[in-house]
Amino acid sequence: MSAKDIKFGPEARNLMLDGVNMLANAVKVTLGPKGRNVVLDKSFGGPTITKDGVSVAQEITLEGKFENMGAQMVKEVASKTNDIAGDGTTTATVLAQALVTEGVKSVAAGMNPMDLKRGIDKATEVAVNALHDFSQPCNDTKAIAQVGTISANSDVSVGDIIADAMEKVGQAGVITVEEGSGFENELDVVEGMQFDRGYLSPYFVNNQDTMTADLESPFVLLHDAKISNIRDLLPALEIVQKSSKALLIIAEDIDGEALATLVVNNMRGIVKVAAVKAPGFGDRRKAILEDIAILTGSVVISEEVGLSLEKVTEEHLGTAKRIEIGKENTVIVDGAGKKSNIDGRVNQIKAQIETTTSDYDKEKLLERLAKLSGGVAVIKVGAATEVAMKEKKDHVDDALHATRAAVEEGVVPGGGVALVRTIKALDGLTGDNHDQNIGIDIAKRAMEAPLRQIVTNGGGEASVVLNNVADGKDNYGYNATTEEYGDMLKMGILDPTKVVRAALQHAASISGLMITTEAMITDIPQDATPTASPDMGGMGGMGGGMM
């Protein structure tokens, strides 16, 4: 085991804070409508230009081991916020920096770190509840477009195309983002279904760029039981080989000899095939398999209805225009099922929704309905150059996640105003002791940081703007684009409640851990060991002289 370098107390916290500041200072310049770009050097190809906070954070690894630990913990804040809300990574980073900076100062002044953490946690809990109380539902097309526009750095065309996509496939419909071939953004809507099961083996992947298995006009075989013996699949594989088409197998499970043989055949190019587990469990799995069967024009091979894999014919196999299988999701685009059958199934599910008394069952039925009737919308991003294309695609991805979050939990005034308003909800909050009260005050000051940073990036005077906004009520705030004050909702400056909530919760969580850190341990870098042993000739001569 290599030797360790250990730092304690203030020295450890200050080194960690240096790392936090290095990462946060690079990320926070991107915040707001007048945020700046960051250029990322790539080991291959040209540099990437981005205003996406999580993209900047992920590129940063610091030389100093202790500083890097601090930077990596803040990177975790950005990544977790991105995973849950899909946006708000820069806001989360700014909040984390403010909390850690003030927290480390307070610990240095003699405060108890555990009590500071408890104070921050109490304030965060109350602030999150206040955000939900302040939140307004986001259901109409105009509000959805506004959320998308703000998230895409005030690009109105992005907000409009996302709102249009949601209108066409429904708010629960599947929307994907691709690189287009023209200069303008385009929207394609195709009937389709997505479910949360991916490929059973990474060896089915045939698109290395997206790490997906893309099948064009494949046959679809559905089975409601486990497949372990390859002999069961031979009739279906022979049909597929004769037609030179691909095959997607969806079954309860595929393992052992059957999976191994499919992988080998696929890698050798004998049969283009992919295998996926059937989504859901029990009776719900059977219902979803039947949905897929109706969508693709196939038949579920089930012993319950007297069908077995050994007797499969081409009539039992369905097809679709395209099927994309990722690590965790499968999208079936333009299934070959009859429209009358699909409409009948949709009406059947609607009838079940009306009669069910269970909220859980109703939610699952609504999911199935959206997948059957909603279809898939594809936003094709257009730009003049490849660098601009990548940046624009990041914007559209962020905006799409933000609009989904807005539909899910509602919206609050944007531009950092919502967090400033929640500070008032903390006015009557007190901790169990003085140090916890300091923790609550730290959280209050940190909640001002996003608004301050937005104003600073726009070249304004942060303290003046903050005081003016704090004196206002409800949705009153500052529009950094026009440098005017007014009702943020009327000006179309909205943030999804889920994004603001996730940013605050993750920033508070990681910051609490960093403030309470008392020791840091890392490996001491090893010098290169010499390849040859040193010459011992001199010692031999010395020995000879002493005889």
UniProtKB/Swiss-Prot annotation:
Its Gene Ontology cellular component terms are: cytoplasm
Q: Where does ATP bind?
A: T30, L31, G32, P33, K51, D87, G88, T89, T90, T91, G415, D495
UniProt enzyme class: isomerase
What are its E.C. numbers?
5.6.1.7
Coiled-coil ranges from the UniProt annotation: none
- What UniProt keywords apply to this chain's record, in alphabetical order? ATP-binding, Chaperone, Cytoplasm, Isomerase, Nucleotide-binding
Q: Where is this region: Disordered?
A: 526-547
TM spans, by residue?
A: none
- GO biological process: any one? protein refolding
Whether Ligase counts among this entry's keywords is: no
Q: Which domain of life is it from?
A: Bacteria
Q: Which InterPro entries did the record assign?
A: Chaperonin_Cpn60_CS (IPR018370), Cpn60/GroEL (IPR001844), Cpn60/GroEL/TCP-1 (IPR002423), GroEL-like_apical_dom_sf (IPR027409), GROEL-like_equatorial_sf (IPR027413), TCP-1-like_intermed_sf (IPR027410)
State one molecular function term (GO): ATP binding
Where does this polypeptide localize?
Cytoplasm
> Reaction catalysed by this chain?
ATP + H2O + a folded polypeptide = ADP + phosphate + an unfolded polypeptide
Where would you say this protein principally sits, based on its record?
cytoplasm
Q: Please note every region of biased composition (Gly residues).
A: 537-547
Q: How does it assemble?
A: Forms a cylinder of 14 subunits composed of two heptameric rings stacked back-to-back. Interacts with the co-chaperonin GroES.
Q: Which family does it belong to?
A: Belongs to the chaperonin (HSP60) family.
Q: What does this protein do?
A: Together with its co-chaperonin GroES, plays an essential role in assisting protein folding. The GroEL-GroES system forms a nano-cage that allows encapsulation of the non-native substrate proteins and provides a physical environment optimized to promote and accelerate protein folding.
Query: What's the protein name?
Result: Chaperonin GroEL
Q: What organism does this protein naturally occur in?
A: Vesicomyosocius okutanii subsp. Calyptogena okutanii (strain HA)
